[in-house]
From Swiss-Prot:
Residues 1-14 have a biased composition (Polar residues). It comes from Dictyostelium discoideum (Social amoeba). Residues 1-42 are annotated as: Disordered. This is Putative uncharacterized protein DDB_G0267946.
């Protein structure tokens, strides 16, 4: 028989809330996600480098 553990309630409640995800447009998790730099710039890919200079001028360099 299954022993009910009261400490599991928070996790169970969280799982029950998954269907009401506030971000329904979120795509399924990619089983092979590309490397993502931790710089809060999700639009970057491995062919794009962006430098931000102290004068706030944005230089976009695209490496072919």
């Amino acid at each position: 028989m299954f022993n009910f553990d009261p400490t599991d309630q928070p996790t169970d409640q969280h799982l029950l809330q998954l269907p009401t995800d506030p971000h329904p447009l979120q795509q399924p998790i990619d089983p092979h996600p590309p490397p993502q730099p931790n710089n809060n710039l999700p639009f970057l890919n491995n062919h794009t480098i962006i430098y931000i200079y102290p004068n706030n001028q944005l230089t976009h360099i695209h490496n072919q």
